[in-house]
From Swiss-Prot:
InterPro entries: Insulin, Insulin-like, Insulin-like_sf, Insulin_CS, Insulin_family. GO terms for cellular component: extracellular space. It comes from the Eukaryota. Belongs to the insulin family. This is Insulin 2. It is found in: Secreted. GO terms for biological process: glucose metabolic process. The keyword Disulfide bond applies. Disulfide bonds join C8-C36, C20-C49, C35-C40. Keywords: Carbohydrate metabolism, Disulfide bond, Glucose metabolism, Hormone, Secreted. Its main location: secreted. Insulin decreases blood glucose concentration. It increases cell permeability to monosaccharides, amino acids and fatty acids. It accelerates glycolysis, the pentose phosphate cycle, and glycogen synthesis in liver. It comes from Batrachoididae sp.
Length: 50
């Protein structure tokens, strides 16, 4: 598994598509705080999947 990393903008959206796939995801300001301002991992991203 990849180490936690900072994901912002299009990198964050691409990572969400990769992790969530066909389930889709919801995007709110909380994920920016969690993954852009601080590093996050795959499990953090999964919490935003539908």
């Amino acid at each position: 598994m990849a180490p936690p990393q900072h994901l912002c903008g299009s990198h964050l959206v691409d990572a969400l598509y990769l992790v969530c796939g066909d389930r889709g995801f919801f995007y709110n300001s909380g994920i920016v705080e969690q993954c852009c301002h601080r590093p996050c991992d795959k499990f953090d991203l999964q919490s935003y999947c539908n």
